[in-house]
Amino acid sequence: MAWEVFAIYHKDQPLWRGLLNQIELDRNNMDLWIRRPCVNDPKTDDYVREHLTRFVRLHRDFRPLFYNIADELGQGDQIRPNDFCHSTHCTSKFAEYLRKMYGTPANVGREWFVTEETRWDDESLKNGSHWATSNLMVNRTTTDQAFDTVAVAAFEAKCGGIAGLNKAWGTNFPAPHSGAGGREQWEPLRALLSETRSLPELTEKTLSERLGPIEKANARWGTHTTWAAEQRPTEFKSWSEVVAFLNRFYHELSQVRSTEGWNVSPWCDFRNFMDETFADAIGRARAVCKAEDPHARCATEGGQAPFAFGWYNYENVVKHVDVIEPYNIGNNVEVIRSLNPDVIMISTHGFQHKPGAPLTEEDRLYQKRAPQPIWWGLFHGHRGSIIWDDNLPEYRFVDEETRQLTPAASTFADTFLELHKGIAKLIINSRRLHDGIAIQYSQPSMQVHWLLDNLQHAREWMLHSGGDRGSHFTGVRNGWTKLIEDLGLQYEFVGARQIEQGKLTRNEFRALILPQSLAVSSREVEQIRQFVHTGGILIADYRAATMNEHGRDLGRGQLDDLFGITHSKGQPSGSGVSGMENYLSLHLQGRKLDLMIGDEGLRATTGKALAQSGQIPLIVVNDFGQGKAVFLNVELASYPYQRLTRNSPTSLPEIMEQVFGLAGIQPQARVLDEAGKRLAGAEAVRFANGAYEHVAIFCNPQFDDGGWGDLPTQAERGWAGPIDNSRLEKQAQITVAWPAGMATYDIRGRRDLGIIDKIQMTLDPWSPVVLTRAPKPIPVLRVEAPIEAQPGNPLLVTLRNESPLPEGAFRIVRLEFVKPDSKPYELYARNVRVESTPHLERLHLAYNDPQGRWQINAHDLITGRVARTEFTLR
């Protein structure tokens, strides 16, 4: 409805590309980073209010399923990096944001490492003087300045200061007097970087033409000193020396892998503000719709991966939408269903086929694959599907000339028909279960990781970065989710704010995972400590809580004492990884392990090093209160690829199975292959229905390439992703095993399997096995109807249990009607939720319904049983 406000830079690509071309040549002009339209401009609110009010009034009488505010939206072009928005409206709002967070300008200065912050930006704008408006806080928040800050931290750690750089590189930047220092000493270097970054190519010619004589440039750069250093020229002898210096500088910056000494809090604070203020604008649009239509559900479509840009901090997003259509990217589906299960998720599906062309074997393979994401979505929180037809010849479901269904329609027909007949309603109305595993969702960590990922693009970050495929943090998060799922377990993401508010201490979780969570607040740390002290298991990989939530390095890990570790300079590694000790459920002594080292500078202190490579510990366990902390000095980002590779030697699954054993976490339904081993790539999801439990078992492919980086892919076709999932595309003979025998029913196969603790079945690579488990056999359902009924009158159908269902349990019953000519009558078919009986279902018969004997079939989804009755229409 309002793409021209919320998705303008994606839908209008010439506008976006033109903006980037301008910015590339004028990097320090913040007027170019004024978003048009600005979401905080009152005129934008007026437009949205008028436009959406008119739109909703036009459609509300038709009771639409939802109102789509915008598709594929974002501050810039979806998640592509940007420095929006530097309008006066956003600058004033940013001042309000900082005032609420920090209280005083001096507190901002202390956090940002900036001296003499004395007034807020909204006050400076009101002042209007050149001095006031040229020294705005918001001017310190740009991505270029963040990369400069990272560079200064890296070179300070390496050289000690500007004097050390001069000595090591043979340069002659003005250096502070002996005993003086600080970050300000690097200002001459930052001045050089600032002047040269607007040149697309670093050549003697372009530098000379743009910046003038080298002598004048030296003089300009040399004036950027503090009281501690003498102002003097920088003494580059020629532009060729500057080119060589910059090439070396950016090469060494691209090699940085540590966040030691970083303080990117101005940038992180502004990114958080923009995510929040954009989400607030969506919230205002939603409020306009609901004011006109109290029944309105408001949506955004084309949801991207959780990311440092766009507005895709899902802790904000899920507060401002009722419905979302997320592209299944970067685990966003898992994040959404975890952070707010009340948000309705839907997915979009289609099949590409040239009209009139015969189906090839490849086409038929893609037809088999196409419905798989629909089943997957059902078990991961989706509640509906959009069919991508758009009347495009290669996607349309109905041939306009022949009025026949196309191969695109037949691809999905059987799946949609089965879902329509009740199984979807059963799963949607049941409660998804997890195994007590929480994964932290950390937007600040995501932001810092984006900087780490893109140091190689520091000069051209807006042009050569921005995709989720290159996001290492996305790869780590995906590695954790796939690893847990492969073990037959489930999890929930827990947001940083939820942790601060005490969610970990409500006895819902037994283990917490920090997936390279670099940036963690002190309030989170306090809650995490309490969680472990009272018996929880904390698990982290090799980057954990070394920064605060603003992106400022603290010089130590806030949880290092809890893990029993410390950090030092690199230590020698061995030729492999060996298990050194056993510890409770961890049986590692004498084992050769296939693991990738994370941090070569890690050392164990009070923690026990259970596995090492040379002097480097890889698995460290430490007792803390009643709980334990496990530090995995291991890289997980490549696990999603390893799991799809035949005969992969990775030890991660067996290690994590034993780590979860410390918390008593074991799969409640084990899926085994013919050899009795865990079936590779299978996922099991359980749903609670009162005392009953529904279990879905299915092959778990990799649908997207988020975090895939340089790992191998294959050619992409249409809706199919570029990942090779062929290892999981074979029919498997499986055994499903449970800890105890219970009454078990095959929902899709409509079979009563009896009281069992294991069952052998065939698992199709494209569709699931779905079972019901019950403490005792489920009561039989009866269906009753009057002996006779009359056309035009109501018909009352009674559903009755032979004995009551357990408290909180329900059935989904598919009522279907068969006419006297033995043909089904879809008009009266429906899915009925039955909680207690007798349940009366009323339907109105038409005057022109055929007279004779009708049959009613009541299919009980949870058991597969079908009850029947008849009535005569006369």
Predicted features, each with a name:
Residues 26-33, 58, 68, 77, ...:
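Hydrophobic targeting/anchoring helices
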Residues 33-46, 50-318, 323, 335, ...:
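Polysaccharide-binding and catalytic clefts of secreted carbohydrate-active enzymes
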Residues 366-370, 386, 504, 515-784:
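A conserved amphipathic helix/loop scaffold
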Residues 768-773, 851-862:
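Short, aromatic- and glycine-rich surface loops/edge beta-strands on solvent-exposed regions
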Residues 776-778, 860-868:
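Short acidic/polar inter-strand loop motif in beta-rich domains
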Residues 782-783, 865-874:
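Edge beta-strands of extracellular beta-sandwich domains
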Residues 793-803, 813-817:
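Beta-strand-rich structural segments
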Residues 833-843:
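Aromatic sugar-binding surface patches on proteins
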